[in-house]
């Protein structure tokens, strides 16, 4: 055990200021801000701030009764950097800068580089010493430096620190306490990382942290900076990575913050057509200004280095890339070349990623980019933006639209399930089901699903199984793993009492098992970004809303994935098999353990010689209604495949689970209830589960389907050509989603309160 961070000393040489003005001071926080020092045998605090337009600046606080001018600062460079040493000041003393503008007005500003701040509604900065924390995560750090960032498992649990779980009376846990509560849950559920909504200091709870005023201070709502260090340290000790939401695109207009810092535009673009997001009520950074570049890049590295954060999810990248983002005609000006691209922001993002990943190639730089901007995750040297991951917003929009559609009409929307594969390997994608999808009237993930109570759970299980098998890393917002009915509310904890109900506990158990299965099977994560890890089997059975594909690992092991997006039992469904031999069902979302009907394959399924879907052999299986199935593909071809399958159609069983190899820990509740109803849930007409018989093959006749209220006609299975070549070509030309050609509007409109 040893402190891994040396005490941050202010640097009094001219070099930090020179680098700062060149845009190359990547550790500006070591120079600017408030630092404990001893000068001529006297301890105190040295303050430094950048304010190029100020006529005068003084430091005010309790120590001088907030009297302007009593402790004036002086320019150290004769230009824009101000400094003052005040003896006798100590840690936790509250202060602000009193700035005299060129117009003669006085404005009181929090320190842009403060390490700690008062808790809202107060907004003063606090002197804080970051040194002295003892880290215990050396083993984690060493392992991360050796890890394969791109080709490793990543299954992220996105969460809001103040509303995941609360104490009695609705009080939040502090950072360290939160870790103690969170770690057992994350370990039990099998997630690899947690991703925190912004924890940089912010004044307005309703912004969820996306309106930042303190880019170097963890919000004091949940404790001190060292409490946050303890959170990260404990997570790492438990083998859990920590990703943090970081917001360089814009900042709020709070008078104590960065806005018009010295009476004029400093951090924001001075051009009103470029410097403001009117729809959001926030200001846009001046990305072309060197001092702003030093500020933002220093902030990014600060969290990665001083707090050992494993990666940053960079918010609202699309708003940075386009000058016309959410702006009407006449509200924006083209760049010097006449285009709508923000050339300064593009250059900044490349510089940011080159700097961060140049120092720390094992860290994550994840772009929330909602358009089809090309080469987001390609190196800047090749013309890319230099991120190593990007959220797949096209997949998210298409799939949520598809899953909300009544199953009776899904056949006409089949392209929404398959379209993402045209571009799945064009970027290093993360599949996000994030906080943005469960707020503002959109409904929780469970309540997006069509049908009645049981139907919603079956749909959600099917979707989760499909999502886990789709190429790309995974992200799920808190509460969706157990079927939160209500939309997320940042003021309240999740509805944990829902786990007293069978369906919610069974859904949670399914997600737990699915997460464990994911980690144990490299085929689901080792080759996420190449056609080498994926192959279509059935891409176009739109009439029956069925797809099937293979996922592969580097050793050649394969998993066959079959998704039935209709509440129809399909007996005798025949599909091509890549290898002859025995196929073993290893996960089934319809397993009774997970709340399904229990239609499972208790016996292995053998191939027969009938060619299908471009393969020399095929298998015939039973697809439970609304389900995702995983089969283990034989690793070696047998000399002689069985001509006919000797297996009988699968039978319902509630006793024996087919889950093999994954951790299966059913949630046990002594007072579990039968059913939980959603609040104000509109009645939805139930689509009855029916049986449909696939076209009978010449060598095998499955059992006749029983009569039910509905009799959808099954389409004959037709051989299809492999689509990999077509998809590779299409990937070069098609955008990420057919409906998304313009930047998507964000719904976050909350304005920051006045000071």
In which residue ranges do the predicted regions lie?
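Carbohydrate-interacting/catalytic domains
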Residues: 1-152, 176-186, 454-457, 468-476, ...
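Intrinsically disordered, polybasic Lys/Arg-rich low-complexity tracts
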Residues: 636-755
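Short glycine-biased active-site loop of nucleotidyltransferases that positions the nucleotide triphosphate
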Residues: 74, 205-209, 253-260, 377-378, ...
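Substrate-binding/active-site clefts of carbohydrate-active enzymes
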Residues: 118, 138-153, 160-341, 605
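Short, flexible loop/turn elements at secondary-structure junctions
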Residues: 51-53, 77, 88, 160-165, ...
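Non-transmembrane alpha-helical segments in soluble domains
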Residues: 183, 232, 300-304, 353, ...
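Conserved alpha/beta catalytic core and glycan-binding cleft of carbohydrate-active enzymes
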Residues: 308-310, 325-490, 498, 519-575, ...
């Amino acid at each position: 055990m040893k402190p891994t961070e040396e005490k941050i000393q202010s640097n009094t040489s001219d070099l930090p200021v020179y680098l700062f003005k060149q845009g190359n001071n990547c550790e500006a926080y070591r120079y600017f801000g408030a630092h404990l020092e001893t000068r001529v045998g006297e301890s105190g605090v040295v303050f430094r701030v950048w304010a190029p337009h100020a006529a005068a600046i003084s430091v005010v606080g309790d120590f001088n009764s907030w009297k302007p001018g009593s402790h004036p600062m002086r320019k150290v460079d004769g230009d824009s950097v101000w400094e003052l040493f005040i003896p006798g000041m100590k840690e936790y003393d509250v202060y602000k800068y009193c700035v005299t503008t060129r117009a003669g007005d006085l404005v009181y500003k929090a320190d842009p580089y403060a390490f700690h701040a008062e808790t809202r509604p107060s907004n003063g900065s606090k002197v804080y010493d970051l040194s002295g924390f003892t880290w215990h995560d050396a083993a984690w750090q060493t392992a991360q430096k050796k890890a394969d960032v791109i080709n490793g498992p990543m299954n992220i649990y996105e969460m809001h620190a103040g509303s995941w779980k609360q104490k009695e009376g609705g009080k939040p846990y502090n950072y360290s306490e939160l870790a103690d509560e969170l770690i057992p849950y994350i370990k039990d559920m099998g997630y690899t990382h947690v991703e925190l909504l912004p924890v940089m200091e912010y004044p307005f709870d309703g912004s969820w942290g996306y309106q930042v005023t303190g880019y170097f201070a963890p919000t004091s709502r949940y404790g001190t900076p060292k409490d946050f260090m303890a959170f990260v340290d404990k997570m790492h000790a438990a083998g859990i990575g920590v990703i943090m939401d970081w917001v360089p695109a814009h900042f709020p207009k709070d008078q104590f913050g960065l806005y018009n810092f010295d009476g004029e535009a400093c951090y924001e673009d001075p051009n009103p057509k470029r410097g403001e997001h009117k729809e959001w009520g926030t200001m846009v950074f001046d990305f072309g200004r060197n001092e702003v570049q030093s500020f933002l890049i220093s902030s990014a590295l600060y969290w990665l280095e001083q707090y050992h954060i494993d990666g940053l999810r960079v918010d609202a990248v699309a708003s940075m890339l386009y000058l016309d983002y959410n702006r009407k005609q006449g509200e924006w000006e083209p760049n010097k070349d006449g285009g709508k691209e923000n050339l300064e922001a593009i250059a900044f993002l490349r510089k940011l990623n080159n700097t961060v990943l140049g120092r720390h190639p094992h860290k994550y730089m994840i772009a929330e980019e909602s358009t089809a901007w090309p080469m987001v995750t390609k190196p800047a040297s090749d013309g890319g933006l230099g991120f190593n991951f990007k959220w797949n917003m096209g997949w998210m929009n298409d799939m949520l639209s598809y899953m909300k559609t009544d199953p009776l009409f899904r056949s006409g929307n089949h392209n929404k399930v398959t379209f993402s594969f045209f571009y799945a390997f064009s970027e290093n994608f993360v599949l996000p089901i994030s906080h943005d999808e469960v707020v503002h009237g959109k409904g929780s993930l469970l309540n997006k699903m069509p049908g009645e109570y049981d139907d919603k759970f079956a749909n959600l299980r099917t979707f989760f199984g499909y999502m886990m098998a789709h190429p790309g890393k995974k992200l799920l917002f808190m509460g969706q793993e157990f079927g939160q009915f209500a939309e997320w509310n940042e003021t309240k904890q999740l509805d944990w009492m829902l786990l007293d109900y069978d369906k919610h506990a069974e859904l949670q158990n399914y997600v737990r098992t699915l997460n464990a299965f994911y980690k144990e099977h490299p085929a689901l994560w080792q080759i996420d970004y190449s056609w080498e890890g994926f192959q279509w089997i059935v891409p176009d059975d739109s009439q029956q809303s069925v797809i099937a594909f293979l996922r592969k690992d580097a050793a050649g092991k394969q998993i066959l994935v079959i998704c039935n997006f209709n509440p129809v039992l399909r007996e005798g469904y025949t599909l091509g098999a890549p290898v002859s031999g025995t196929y073993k069902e290893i996960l089934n979302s319809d397993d009774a353990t997970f709340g399904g009907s229990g239609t499972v394959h208790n016996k292995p399924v053998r191939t027969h010689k009938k060619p299908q879907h471009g393969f020399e052999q095929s298998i015939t299986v039973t697809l439970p209604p609304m389900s995702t199935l995983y089969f283990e593909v034989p690793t070696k071809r047998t000399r002689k495949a069985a001509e006919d399958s000797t297996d009988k159609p699968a039978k319902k069983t509630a006793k024996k689970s087919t889950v093999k190899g994954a951790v299966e820990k059913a949630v046990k509740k002594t007072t579990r209830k039968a059913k939980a109803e959603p609040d104000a849930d509109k009645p939805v007409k139930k689509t009855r589960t029916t049986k449909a018989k696939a076209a009978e093959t010449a060598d095998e006749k499955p059992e006749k389907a029983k009569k039910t209220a509905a009799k959808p006609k099954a389409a004959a299975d037709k051989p299809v050509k492999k689509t990999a070549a077509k998809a590779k070509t299409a990937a070069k030309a098609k955008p990420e989603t057919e409906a998304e050609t313009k930047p998507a509007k964000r719904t976050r409109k909350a304005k920051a309160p006045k000071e």
